[in-house]
Design a protein with these regions (language model features):
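Active-site-adjacent structural elements that line small-molecule/cofactor binding pockets in enzymes
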Residues: 1-341
């Protein structure tokens, strides 16, 4: 059994349950404790690039990552501009995490058609990499045609790492072909092991080193002696994703062996708001929590981190459940501090 040392990331999400001042303070504390990276997401809350810009100017060494920036809400050119700006502001600390999001958010929030996500991801990354290289961009793809422009910005001498949030067999395989890292969310250790096969197959197709891809899953985490309280938070969090975020997470949980639970959660979520939320959370079983989350005592959470390390994870990214206040976040950060593992 292995414990990952000095390699932990911190995901802030986009629910904005903490104030901006609290987020800055927590990020600075994470930097002091040896956390390697901080990640900001975006769904329909604050956008990731603005949040990370604020964090970049208040920190000096911790890496900053988009978690994730959706490729359906920005053009490849805009993504390249934003990445170049943030990498410059942060002094070369950016990790560009990209994802397709899902049909519900893309169609109902951004008003865009969710079409050909795999092809779009491939072309977006092609164009962004070309733009960030400083070369003139002349690109003719199936979805994007860009001609005659060179990014007008002071560019870093390094290659900005690009990581992909992917779930399915084909998308994970493509991640192995074209990305520097894989950003799954809520995987079991069994799914990590299975997906590493798909990643390796993609890397082989692209004639890449099969170990070149960072394995950085998002893991729902809370360390507390009040086991019942944090498990209830985790139940509510998973219920929201499985029941209220379209079919993506519902299908993911089914793939991981929890079909009955997933259907019960989705059915409960469809009920009137308060009744539905409570029923959906109650349908999240202890077996699901034990397989998918890291909540409980310090000893139990460190044991779970070791299990993920054994499965092939290289950089766990810790996400806190909805309802976690600053005290719980600080307690968790201190309990898992990389400089003491």
């Amino acid at each position: 059994m292995r414990i990952l040392r000095r390699r932990l990331g911190l995901a802030l999400g986009s629910a904005n349950t903490l104030s901006r001042a609290e987020i800055i303070a927590l990020t600075r504390r994470a930097e002091e404790l040896g956390y390697e990276s901080v990640w900001a997401g975006e769904s329909w809350g604050f956008d990731a690039f603005t949040t990370l810009t604020e964090l970049a100017v208040h920190t000096s060494t911790i890496k900053i990552g988009t978690h994730i920036a959706t490729i359906f809400s920005r053009t490849p050119g805009m993504l390249a501009q934003s990445a170049a700006s943030l990498d410059d502001i942060s002094g070369g600390r950016l990790i560009l995490g990209l994802g397709t999001s899902g049909p519900k958010v893309v169609r109902d929030w951004h008003g865009q058609s969710w079409e050909r996500p795999l092809r779009r991801m491939r072309e977006v990354i092609d164009i962004v990499r070309l733009a960030l290289s400083g070369e003139r961009v002349d690109y003719e793809g199936e979805l994007f045609k860009v001609s005659g422009f060179r990014l007008r910005a002071a560019l870093s001498k390094r290659d900005v790492p690009i990581m992909i949030a992917s779930l399915g067999h084909r998308s994970v395989g493509q991640t192995g072909e074209i990305a520097d890292g894989w950003l799954p969310i809520f995987p079991t250790t069994a799914l990590v092991r299975e997906s590493l096969i798909w990643l390796a197959q993609g890397a082989v197709r692209a004639k890449r080193d099969t170990t070149a891809v960072e394995i950085a899953p998002t893991l729902l985490t809370a360390v507390s002696d009040d086991d019942a309280a944090v498990r209830d938070m985790a139940r509510a969090h998973l219920a929201f994703y499985i029941g209220g975020m379209g079919s993506f997470y519902h299908d993911l949980v089914i793939r991981q062996g929890f079909a009955t639970e997933a259907d019960r959660i989705k059915s409960a979520w469809a009920k009137p708001r308060r009744e539905g939320r409570e029923a959906a959370a109650a349908a999240v079983t202890d077996e699901m929590l034990d397989a998918i989350t890291l909540v409980g005592s310090r000893t139990s959470v460190l044991g779970r981190l070791s299990a993920y390390a054994d499965a092939g994870v290289t950089l766990p990214i810790l996400m806190f459940p909805f309802g976690a206040d600053r005290a719980l976040v600080e307690q968790t950060l201190e309990a898992l501090r990389p400089d003491r593992q």
